[in-house]
From Swiss-Prot:
Location of the protein in the cell: Plastid, Chloroplast
One protein family per Pfam: MatK_N
GO biological process, one term: tRNA processing
Name this protein carries in UniProt: Maturase K
Main location: plastid
Function: Usually encoded in the trnK tRNA gene intron. Probably assists in splicing its own and other chloroplast group II introns.
Similarity-based family: Belongs to the intron maturase 2 family. MatK subfamily.
Keyword line: Chloroplast, mRNA processing, Plastid, RNA-binding, tRNA processing
Cellular component annotations (GO), alphabetically ordered: chloroplast
InterPro entries per UniProt: Domain_X, Maturase_MatK, Maturase_MatK_N
GO molecular function: RNA binding
């Protein structure tokens, strides 16, 4: 237990105590709204776009806001009196977004510096694109999952109260005024949403209007969920792997989970690690969904499921439904992850063996990691985007009908290329071909609607080469990337190719 306590309280001396004064520095707000920083190569900063306010920002507005914050009675006025308190009046959203964006930049500074120091200790700073590629997960799946037996499909629950996020951040930042300001944001959105829509969730308004700050707090919560998992994994592994998590300090983490661990460990932590001991355990997460795969038995996965449910209840003080964790065998289970429907089916085959005059058949079974495009959910996403109806029949897109012909073709072509690029790792291309067909015909219907013509007449007038790039763009890209391939491109196009330049999930795929 002493080893656990020391692990969870690691690097407490690095906690940040004085962040609140930075809120009154004008350059912080300029930094929060400078979208050019991302182009200069900084991968610690990902600008969050806030529609409708970027163009209105100026240094003069920041000065006025800072001046108002200096007033003693400014932040303590009643939130119910919108005439006296302009912070919750018609400028409420603008002012709160400016402060929250600045606050997000400030709290990220400490973690960015810590990440730099951890990379310098390893004497190797990887390139930013290697840190951010999400397609790099699938080659890992190809190498590992075919040798495993069980998988747990986990949906990480949201905390029921926003105060939990403040308490998690308190373990990293001991600047009391900053935490009070964060509570003020939550209190403001709670009261404002109750006045407008009493049944509206606090998460909805805050996450939509303050995306950067909300994502930072949610990521802090996810790191908290995974910290004890990383510790158990490092203690039970035969080969002590280096953890990729660099923000694992917890000031009061040990006291909160002590009661839960005593029940599990029976006052002897080392002797009970066999409950979770599995050298072939693999854990992958993206956003709020994670995959826990193991070569162990179904009983071991049930122990992990019970652990997660009790951990969320004891440490975060909320009950999570056990149905959020599904345990299945790889042989008869498919799971959604990053827009793909993945599985590890068993492929039986018979091999004829000849020995002298005798011949016999040997039955063999092989496992192969398969990834396909989930066509039904994908059609639903295309239907929401108004490219087709719910049955998958292409329709015109009226909102683009007022654009020029070149702009319409460019938008449809860009959408098609992005989806083709994202789903390049699909094992079967039939679903991808159907998506291309929907986008191609939707483009033709949109152009025909604009010119008040029929699709048949429009295509006949332009010829069969119309929109050919919808189907040939990927092969052109492959010919540039792999110019020395000796076999035909159409055969190469049927192979799975993972691109390591994809840094975020596709917008249409994100609807799945």
């Amino acid at each position: 237990m002493e080893e656990l306590k020391g692990y969870l309280e690691k690097s407490r001396s690095k906690q940040q105590h004085f962040l609140y004064p930075l809120l009154f520095q004008e350059y912080i707000y300029a930094l929060a709204h400078d979208h050019g920083l991302n182009v200069n190569g900084s991968f610690f900063y990902e600008p969050a776009e806030i529609s409708g306010y970027d163009k209105k920002f100026s240094s003069l507005l920041a000065k006025r806001l800072i001046t108002r914050m200096y007033q003693q009675n400014y932040l303590i006025n009643s939130v119910n009196d919108s005439n006296q308190n302009r912070f919750v009046g018609h400028n409420r959203n603008f002012y709160s977004q400016m402060i929250s964006e600045g606050f997000a930049v400030i709290v990220e500074i400490x973690f960015s510096l810590r990440l730099v120091s951890s990379l310098e200790e390893k004497k190797e700073i990887p390139k930013s694109q290697n840190l951010r590629s999400i397609h790099s997960i699938f080659p890992f799946f190809e190498d590992k999952l075919s040798h495993l037996n069980c998988v747990s499909d986990i949906l990480i629950p949201y905390p029921v109260h926003l105060e939990i996020l403040v308490q998690i951040l308190q373990c990293w930042i001991q600047d009391v005024p900053s935490l009070h300001l964060l509570r003020f944001f939550f209190h403001e959105y709670h009261n404002w949403n109750n006045l407008i829509t009493p049944k509206k969730s606090n998460y909805y308004g805050f996450s939509k209007e303050n995306p950067r700050l909300f994502l930072f707090l949610y990521n802090s919560y996810v790191v908290e969920c995974e910290s004890i998992l990383v510790f158990l994994r490092k203690q039970s592994s035969y080969l002590r792997s280096t953890s990729s998590g660099t923000f694992l300090e917890r000031a009061h983490f040990y006291e909160k989970i002590e009661q839960h661990l005593v029940v599990l460990c029976c006052n002897d932590f080392q002797k009970t690690l066999w409950l979770f001991k599995d050298p072939f355990m693999h854990y992958v997460r993206y956003q709020g969904k994670s995959i826990l795969a193991s070569k162990g038995t179904h009983l071991l996965m049930k122990k992990w499921k019970s652990y997660f449910v009790n951990f969320w209840q004891c440490h975060f003080h909320f009950w999570s439904q056990p149905c959020r964790i599904h345990i299945n065998q790889f042989s008869n289970f498919s799971f959604y992850f990053l827009g793909y429907l993945s599985s590890v089916p068993i492929n039986p085959s018979a091999v004829k063996s000849q020995m002298l005059e005798n011949s016999f058949l040997v039955d063999t079974a092989t496992k192969k990691f398969e990834t396909i495009v989930p066509i039904i959910p994908m059609i639903g996403a295309l239907s929401k985007a108004k490219f087709c109806n719910v049955s998958g029949n292409p329709i015109s897109k009226p909102v683009w009908a007022d654009l020029s012909d070149s702009d319409i073709i460019d938008r449809f072509g860009r959408t098609c290329r992005n989806l083709s690029h994202y789903y390049s790792g699909s094992s079967k291309k039939q679903s991808l071909y159907r998506i291309k067909y929907i986008l191609r015909l939707s483009c033709a219907r949109t152009l025909a609607r604009k010119h008040k013509s029929t699709v048949r007449a429009f295509l006949q007038r332009l010829g069969s080469e119309f929109l050919e790039e919808f189907f040939t763009e990927e092969e052109k890209a492959l010919s540039l990337i792999l110019p020395r391939i000796s076999y035909p491109l159409h055969k190469l196009y049927r192979e799975r190719i993972w691109y390591l330049d994809i840094i975020r999930i596709n917008d249409l795929v994100n609807h799945l």
